[in-house]
Amino acid sequence: MYVDFMNYMGHCNFELVPKWLFDVFPPLKYLMYTPSFHSLHHTQFRTNYSLFMPFYDYVYGTIDKSSDEQYERSLKGKEERPHVVHLTHLTNLQSIYHLRFGFSSLASKPYTPKYYMWIMWPLTLASMLLTWIYGTAFTAERNRFKKLIMETRVVPRYIFQYKSSSERDAINTLIEKAILQSEEEGAKVISLGLLNQGSALNGYGELYLKRNSLLKTKIVDGTSLAVAGVLNSVPKGTNSILLVGNLSKMAYFLSLTLCKRGVQVEMVQKDKYELLKLQLPPELHGHLVLSDSYASEVWLVGDGVTDQEQLRASKGIRFIPFTQFPPKLVRKDCIYHCTPAMVVPRTYENLHTCENWLPRSVMSAWRVAGIVHALEEWNGHECGDTVTGVEKAWHAALAHGFLPFQGCKLG
């Protein structure tokens, strides 16, 4: 399996092995090759034959003399610097195999846990320890679309670490370092994916603006486009919806937009109802209703929704998540929509992997938002309490060829 892993990594077309790894353990240079090392075999042909262990090329004199120089040059990335960076993170321990340099058979399909992957627990444990000490985000994928070069970078931390308050400062340091690196490289936009834009973690990205007031790279949390994606999933003619789960920036702007459109927003928890009511303009209070019923046919589901709440839903109810992560599938007689996402245009290049649980050629609305922000050359940030505008973001995405994704399934 090690040989297979190294083979996949060697053909991923970009350099991801950090230099400090060889500085800490110099003999590793002879035991493990890098993508840039193997790329010379395809360009120079009679050098760097090794598929995973350069030791034999050194022994038999087939090592390319420019290997170290090529490695350094690839790390610096002088040839192609990204215009847009999407910053995501690892989810569970098996998710590292779902990246492009993991197993292509897994990365090309929507992520689902595989029971047989547990036989690789020694390698999984080693990868967890490596990511724990790894001090920077790494590049997992590069793409092209129109005039833009995009990169997906991964913060080497898992969900359980994001949920730990003791890890908060370290994670913020990693994210801020990635933002400043993107700024140094001339990136126009950096979009924050998954938990990298948490309210408790960094105030939806606002923390980094406070620390770096002269930041030129625009921070995008993607709220506007994600809200638009959720609203597009609500069936036409819907007069009322039930809002459940934790309150958030997404919950507020969803409620605000729905109330402005004359749709009744129902809530069942009084404390959350009172808090949201304080945030909404007084003229919209009549559209926000405290209900003692779960009878609404459309539920907008946030983080924190319980199994007991789902069990109170009537048969055939639509659960539409407005969160980064899909809800637990509790009901087999109800319809579960996908998290906010869009289908990418056919001209989007080099998209060979699935983004987490999304199908091939489908991208989360938060990631699309960063790309659209750069294409439109919008000057403002979308983080903290600021939004680009729901209609503005939606129409811009459609104009650039992104299409609504209406993925749904029975529980």
What is each residue range found by the language model?
Residues 197-203, 272-278, 307-309, 327-330:
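Short, charged/polar "capping" segments at the starts of alpha-helices
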Residues 235-302:
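Glycine-rich phosphate/diphosphate-binding loop of Rossmann-like nucleotide-binding domains
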Residues 116-219, 224, 228, 282, ...:
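Metallocofactor- and cofactor-centric catalytic cores in central/energy metabolism, strongly enriched
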Residues 146, 318-411:
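Adenosine-phosphate binding glycine-rich loop
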Residues 291-325, 335-337:
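Short, well-ordered secondary-structure micro-motifs within conserved domains or adaptor modules
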Residues 224-240:
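A short, basic/flexible loop-to-alpha-helix module at the beginning of a structural domain
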Residues 1-124:
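Cytosolic/stromal cytosol-facing helical appendages immediately following the last transmembrane segment
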